[in-house]
Each structure stands twice: as structure tokens, then as C-alpha cells.
Amino acid sequence: MLVISANEQRNLVNMNEVIAYAALALKEFSAERTITPIRGSLPFANEKNTALIMPSVAEGLEALGLKVVTVVPENKKIGKKTINGIVMLSDFQTGEPLALLEGSYLTMIRTGALSGVATKHLARHNAKTLCIIGTGEQAKGIAEAVFAVRDIEKVILYNRTEEKAYAFSQYIQEKFGKPAYVHTNANEAISEADIIVTTTNASTPVFSEKLQKGVHVNAVGSFKPSMQELPSHAIVGANKVVVESKEAALDETGDLQVPIKEGLFKANAIHAELGQIISGEKAGRENDEEITVFKSVGLAVVDIIVAKYLYEKAVESGVGNKIEF
């Protein structure tokens, strides 16, 4: 069995390739060619933290695996990662353990790739300004993926802890050579954006102003009914609301559950799963005036396909630590 660390994965990753594999996984899922149950969500430590159990089988892609991650928001106060985890791949023919991959980096990359796929199909082609609300680890992968599919010229950042936004601004400028500006008001931050990303642990909406025509939103932070990043009017006012899995999104996120409970939005108003847009079954963006929202909660089959991609690259490159059970 091969053990692949975060650093080893980092050296193997090509974001354009990861985006392509994420799209393939989404397409297989929406065509009902995978077994991807609703993930198990286990609260612990007086419900402050969450463990997520995510298995998947993709028959056509010969992939079988399991991801287990923990989300501990308070870890950031002690300088530790808020997401820790592991992904196990099994041999599709024999069922033997094939690989163990560090899970927090993989999660960051696949979260980014999902937003990359959504941005490719739903953002305006001439989108130039990206606004990111929440500048934690997940924002790194999303920024890289959005840059891969759109020619972004300006980045606007907002974070509750301003110092972290400034640190992220420096990261963007040094790694990607793009100007990045910190705003102290979230409503001001979104006002000039073509693409908005929300990646926070918020339980109440992170902005209140109405969305401008033509904007695209990737909302990736809320993965529990008690979490809500988007104001209800952002969902209700969107021309197209898109998800990875209708079942998972309706089961897991306050971003959809709250407006539904308020009687403002109906489950059947979800435009499509992203895989249906990739396959051409449903339309993506159709004009420059549309407001589009991609509400992401994560999907195990994407993790497993990205893990398989990383495993194959590791074998090809002679990377990783081989161990005997």
C-alpha cells in the first residue's frame, strides 16, 4: 500500500487536470453510474466539531474508496488545521488496500476543482474580478481553480479576521502575480465582483446586499443545516441554482434549507446538478445578465476520483511511501 503525504500530492497536482477529473466524476454521478450515499455526519465534542464519512464506488471509472475527515473550527485559534482527514483507495479488482492519502490537502484541491468546473460553465466568459469571502485553507484551491478557467485581473478579499485577509492577499500576489485588495465590509467587497466565492464556517449570512446582474457565486462553506453563508434572497433571486447532488444539498445545507423553510424557495426550483450541465443535458449560463449560484457541499465520488488521479501520478513518478500491512 502506498502512503501519499500532503507535500507529495502538492508536487503532483496540475489544477487543470484535477478540474477535468472532477468534471468526469460529476458527470458519472449525475448519470447515476456511481454509488455515492449521503455522507455520514457525526457531531462530537458537544457538537462543536464534525466527523464526515464519505464512501463511493464509480464502476465505469474503476474507482473504490472512502474519505474520513474531521472539521474542528476552533483549531485555527491554536494554529492547527480545521480540516484533517484521510482517503483510502482500494484495488477495484481485488479489494486490497491500494493507497492512503492525506485528506486535508486533497479536500482543498477537490473543493477548488469543483468551483473551477462550476465557474467554467456558469460564470461570464469575460469575468475579470474575483471576490473571496473567507480566506482559510480552502480559499487557496478555489482561487487557483478559478484562475485556471477565467482570466482574472483583480482579487477582492474579505475575512472577519483582517490580518488573515492581508496574509492571503500577499499569498495571491506572490504565487499568482495578481493584485489582491482587502475590504473591511463584505457588502462593499461583493459590489464590484464578477465571481463571488464564500468559504466560511458562518451560521448566518456573510453579506446582505442583493446580487448584481451577471454575477456568479460559488458557495462552498455551509455543509450542515445549521450553517448558512448566503442570504435567502441570493438563492431566491438567482436565475440558476446548481448543486453537485440535489439529494445531498437539500439534506445538508442551511443555504437551501433556510429559504425552503421560509417558504421562499422550493426544492424543484434547483436548476440542475453540475454533472447534468457538463453532459449537456441542462444548460449552463445562457446570457450575461443571469445570476448563477453553485451551492457545493462536497461529493465523495469526486474525492475518490481525484485520489485515484493522484495515486496514478505518484506511481508514475515513484513518489510515496510503500508499506506492508
UniProtKB/Swiss-Prot annotation:
Q: Which superkingdom?
A: Bacteria
PANTHER family the UniProt entry points to = KETIMINE REDUCTASE MU-CRYSTALLIN
MF (Gene Ontology): oxidoreductase activity
Which keywords does this Swiss-Prot/TrEMBL entry list?
NAD, NADP, Oxidoreductase
Catalytic function, reaction form: L-proline + NAD(+) = 1-pyrroline-2-carboxylate + NADH + H(+); L-proline + NADP(+) = 1-pyrroline-2-carboxylate + NADPH + H(+)
Please state the Enzyme Commission number of this protein. Answer: 1.5.1.49
Q: Please report which protein family the annotation says this sequence is part of.
A: Belongs to the ornithine cyclodeaminase/mu-crystallin family.
Name of the protein this chain belongs to: Delta(1)-pyrroline-2-carboxylate reductase
Q: What does this protein do?
A: Catalyzes the reduction of Delta(1)-pyrroline-2-carboxylate (Pyr2C) to L-proline, using preferentially NADPH over NADH as the electron donor. Is likely involved in a degradation pathway that converts trans-3-hydroxy-L-proline (t3LHyp) to L-proline.
What InterPro entries has UniProt attached to this entry? NAD(P)-bd_dom_sf (IPR036291), ODC_Mu_crystall (IPR003462), ODC_N (IPR023401)
Per the record, its GO cellular-component terms are: cytoplasm
One Pfam family here: OCD_Mu_crystall
What species is given as this protein's source?
A: Bacillus thuringiensis subsp. konkukian (strain 97-27)
- The main enzyme category here is oxidoreductase
Q: Which gene holds the coding sequence for this protein?
A: arcB
